[in-house]
């Protein structure tokens, strides 16, 4: 009798994706982040669903409803902080996943990579709208500042902003539609993740060496299921430690003040995972230029496959490219730090230099270094 997992229409999809999938024998723990992102998404959808049962998307009651969740709902505080810190874990895994793709040349799988970039945009949009929902001071200011950026679009800008707001300022209509979008987007992300996986399984996984692993494959189960479970346990350990010991560490104290249009907080800043892009936005003294730089800071990922000039796929055997890669990582950490600082003397110039370095590394220095390495290796 043939095994049901290989014949049943539904089971055979699961079987070919997670059980009998031929995987390279040498993929390291950097390949764990795909499954961790899946776990993060499931955690976010489940906790979000339970939060939505108690949340009200009305400007008069939104802040109170979040307080009610934390005070009166059984384990509401736990659900709320799992959701808030789960978003941080989601972005940590995302950044590491993208960094892995850059380092090992996974971007050569064009369809998989482009859907990944689309997923990154979708997750960022979802996180931004989620931050608006508690209707604290920083929620309100963030919504106003970020939506206002669209007014930099020539001719249609101001009309577009009012259309998104549903009025002449960020108000009840804005909050209601943000809640609707915040609810639906994770399901779109889940569908996109399925397509992401579909395209990945067309080619098979990359591996640290960047060479073809067709001659040396092992089944996904039990080898990588066990390996992924270890990663998931570590993720849950870090997330629960964060939630139970310092749930507000990554948040902003201003968001515990109800939104007040008449009172502006001294420093408006987004959540930590947007600070690098926010620093790039602020480093350009022109509104339209800043908005373009902000979008390009993420969109630049889509053109990375076109900038691949090396004859080797991975950076594993390319020490000069490795140096530039880690310089890029350091630069992104610097930008994240600058994004959280006030706009005054030393920080402005540091932010501008870090922004220039960010684009220079990706668009100019890394492709040139790859060409140089080709010559050094007589390729």
Swiss-Prot record:
Keywords: Electron transport, Heme, Iron, Membrane, Metal-binding, Mitochondrion, Mitochondrion inner membrane, Respiratory chain, Transmembrane, Transmembrane helix, Transport, Ubiquinone. Its cofactor is heme b. Heme b b566 binds at residues 97, 196. Pfam families: Cytochrom_B_C (PF00032), Cytochrome_B (PF00033). The keyword Transmembrane helix applies. Its main location: mitochondrion. A ubiquinone binds at residue 201. Binds 2 heme b groups non-covalently. The keyword Transmembrane helix applies. Heme 1 (or BL or b562) is low-potential and absorbs at about 562 nm, and heme 2 (or BH or b566) is high-potential and absorbs at about 566 nm. Belongs to the cytochrome b family. This is Cytochrome b. The gene is MT-CYB.
